Amino acid sequence: MAAYSFGRVEEAHLEGASNLMAINLLLPGEWFKRDAEVSGFDLPRLKKTYFTASHELIAFRMLEFRPMIVTIFDNGSLYKRKSSYPFTVRPSYPLESQCLRDVTLRGEKVSLKDEETNVVGWPVFREDWKRVILRTEVRD
């Protein structure tokens, strides 16, 4: 019984380890960092290079290399929001709502700036759903 219990604990850790390994295989740290910086952290350009990784995985990998917030909306509803140090995830910045609206209406990349934030939004649209990925950088 103890061996089975131990196996279940290992299994729980195995999933996390497998996810980390997959991220590092699909988006190798040093290569991804270089490519992200060269592209200006442009999601479509990075997707062309790392075509086996999802848009979501690429967007969240960006958090490791520059302070920013990544937000994903599916069909207009918040799906996931994460930030990198030194940011804490706050509900949202006003410009993010405008960027979400503009990307959803236009179906193309939108870049907006104000005195507080730079927000870039990308459409990842399919026939049956509309995903919008936002990258928000807060100015010092």
Language model: regions and residue ranges:
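Active-site hotspot residues in diverse enzymes, especially metal/ion-binding acidic/histidine motifs
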Residues: 1-140
